[in-house]
């Protein structure tokens, strides 16, 4: 992935690829993220088994796992994968904005008490691509609000491999 232009992140924040040494830290971010979702009433999006350590290790091995750092200290994680995303091939109740090549953001999680994480992740991703797709659970109201504020368009419902529904969004510049 070649950077198209510089990402403008919040002051003191940078993005770096995750390494095998970061797995435990990322799993801690995921535990904190799961707890935040449950506290906000979203008990269904991430089960105790998802995302798994194996998934995170695979993301790292494939070079798709990233850390958002503040003053060189990791504060959040996400995966950025080149499309096509297999579960995005069928969309119900709507349609994708276009058929252009895209990247997908998955597995966003952060430490407790930090703000602007998703906005910084989106800014970074837009330095690499002009089209981003993302999905989230219907009960994940905070993520839906951030996506709408960031200019994403709701496109419809997609189904994960296990049959779970997710709301699908796309941003195309």
Segments the model singles out, each with a brief description of its role:
Residues 13-28:
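A short beta-loop-alpha structural element at the N-terminal edge
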Residues 35-54:
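Conserved GNAT-fold acetyl-CoA-binding loop/helix
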Residues 67, 73-83:
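Conserved beta-strand in the GNAT
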Residues 79-113:
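Conserved acyl-donor/pantetheine-binding loop and adjacent beta-alpha core of acyl/acetyltransferases
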Residues 110-127, 145-149:
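Conserved acetyl-CoA-binding loop-helix of GNAT-fold acetyltransferases
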Residues 128-139:
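Conserved GNAT acetyl-CoA-binding A-motif
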Residues 135, 153-167:
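Conserved catalytic-core motifs of GNAT/GCN5-like acyltransferases
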Residues 139-156:
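Conserved active-site alpha-helix within GNAT-family acetyltransferase domains
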């Amino acid at each position: 992935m070649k950077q198209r232009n510089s990402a403008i992140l919040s002051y003191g924040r940078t993005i770096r690829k995750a390494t095998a040494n970061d797995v435990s830290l990322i799993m801690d971010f995921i535990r904190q993220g799961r707890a935040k979702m449950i506290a906000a009433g979203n008990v269904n999006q991430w089960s105790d088994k998802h995302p798994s350590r194996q998934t995170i290790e695979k993301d790292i091995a494939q070079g798709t796992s990233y850390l958002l750092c503040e003053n060189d200290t990791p504060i959040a994680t996400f995966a950025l994968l080149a499309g096509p995303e297999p579960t995005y091939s069928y969309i119900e109740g709507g349609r994708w904005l276009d058929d252009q090549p895209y990247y997908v953001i998955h597995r966003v999680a952060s430490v407790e008490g930090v703000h602007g994480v998703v906005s910084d992740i989106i800014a970074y991703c837009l330095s690499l691509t002009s089209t981003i797709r993302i999905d989230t659970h219907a009960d994940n109201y905070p993520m839906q609000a951030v996506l709408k504020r960031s200019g994403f368009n709701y496109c419809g419902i997609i189904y994960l491999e296990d049959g779970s529904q997710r709301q699908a969004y796309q941003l195309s510049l």
